[in-house]
Amino acid sequence: MTPAAERRPLLPFGYARAHSVMLLSSGESCEVFCLAVTAPQALLEARRVAAMPFRLERLEEEAFEKLLVLSYQRDSAEARRMMADIGNELDLYTLAEELPDTDDLLDSEDDAPIIRLINAMLTEAIKEKASDIHIETYERHLQIRFRVDGVLREILRPQRRLAALLISRIKVMASLDIAEKRIPQDGRMALRIGGRAVDVRVSTLPSSYGERVVLRLLDKNSVNLDLLTLGMTPALLRQVDGLIARPHGIVLVTGPTGSGKSTTLYAALSRLDARERNIMTIEDPIEYELEGIGQTQVNAKVDMTFARGLRAILRQDPDVVLVGEIRDGETAQIAVQASLTGHLVLSTLHTNSALGAISRLQDMGVEPFLLSTSLLAVMSQRLVRRLCPHCRQQEPANADTAHQMEIAPGTALWQPRGCAECGFTGYRGRTGIHELLLVDDRVRMAIHRGENEVTLIQQLGTDYMTLRRAGREKALAGITSWQEVLRVTEQPIAEAC
């Protein structure tokens, strides 16, 4: 028998899976694999496509599934070529309306309709500047949603029976196991959409009515690594420049997933002169490639963890080290030791506030006296939607809003309205709001004494720029709305007590 690696499937994946029949060609000969329940009509179709004598073999269901996975994952090159450079001429909504019934798709001679639908979906997502595509399977419908400017909105509801075929094709493209539906899977693919280089991270998750898929889009052409245009004020930028010029210590950026932490760190690195410093990173994954910087990716399959990668980097004579995320006590301990031995360490933490990073590191086992010595600053950030400049309108602040913002009632505030330019959302694009905790002598002594967040923020006083106060400044400037600031920030601890 010819090895599976040398055989090419001749039937479209959808047909092979639906009818439990595979036709594999090695060039000079063909083999047909089926199940005991395979219909005679499917075998006749295989014979028609083969157009030559072939060997027929019936397999058990488990063996058939394994061969199906192996054969069509190796054949994904053709689909990759079809998606290698997606043009701009595809219209998602027209394609969805013109898509034939699912049964016709399964019986079609190629998988082009499904691939075209996926192409159109990706093209539309890039056009809308979406960060994520959600493909969600429910009992009676299939739903596709885009996350645009941090908010999900429904885009399309294709036929419910299309779910399995659509998700299976995405799995093939991401080199995932198409037969495995019981466990989550993660993969990625690199595409060109309208001439733009786009990395797509794929995550699947079993649910009660079928699999859910989330595609995270990383559009390398749209990356802005300018801290000013990312929303920093000139005064804050001067403080950040001073921090990254320090020879050693730890600088942390905190916030939830999708708040722009990695982009901020990349932008900070881009302000350093890589010709005079050895700058190295350990990331999961490498999101953007920076010239002159040594970037290493975490690989759990070979036990290449953040901690292990960081240890190796420290033997490479680095000046500046970026650790994608401090996830555990081991990584935290190594980062602290690195900062105490002459290295500048930049990293991220998942905490809700800058002050929360201190207690999080202590919970990970970092001793207060080491933390107070090594930590230079913590910056917490959020992304807020920008008001659409074409339709925003001014309204006087009511009493509740004025009280929350500590302004006079009736003060004019800009509000979202909605127009064709912003998709009738009232917002277009996003900007950052930032809270920077500089570890000065006062904060250093408080950390050393083990004081909690409430005590710390009370000591910092009203001059301390919390996230909500930073958002207030942007709302007063008409950059965003106060409702948007409330959506992404929490009430400062001192005010909540």
From Swiss-Prot:
Keywords: ATP-binding, Cell inner membrane, Cell membrane, Membrane, Metal-binding, Nucleotide-binding, Protein transport, Translocase, Transport, Zinc. It catalyses: ATP + H2O + cellular proteinSide 1 = ADP + phosphate + cellular proteinSide 2. One of its GO terms (biological process) is protein secretion by the type II secretion system. One of its GO terms (molecular function) is ATP hydrolysis activity. GO terms for cellular component: plasma membrane; type II protein secretion system complex. It is an enzyme of class 7 (translocase). Zn(2+) binds at residues 388, 391, 419, 422. SMART domains: AAA (SM00382). ATP binds at residues 255-262. Its cofactor is Zn(2+). ATPase component of the type II secretion system required for the energy-dependent secretion of extracellular factors such as proteases and toxins from the periplasm. Acts as a molecular motor to provide the energy that is required for assembly of the pseudopilus and the extrusion of substrates generated in the cytoplasm. The keyword Translocase applies. Its EC number is 7.4.2.8. This is Type II secretion system protein E. Gene3D superfamilies: 3.30.450.90, P-loop containing nucleotide triphosphate hydrolases, Type II secretion system, protein E, N-terminal domain. Its main location: membrane. Signal peptide: none annotated. Belongs to the GSP E family. It comes from the Bacteria. Forms homooligomers; most probably hexamers. Interacts with PulL/GspL. It is found in: Cell inner membrane.
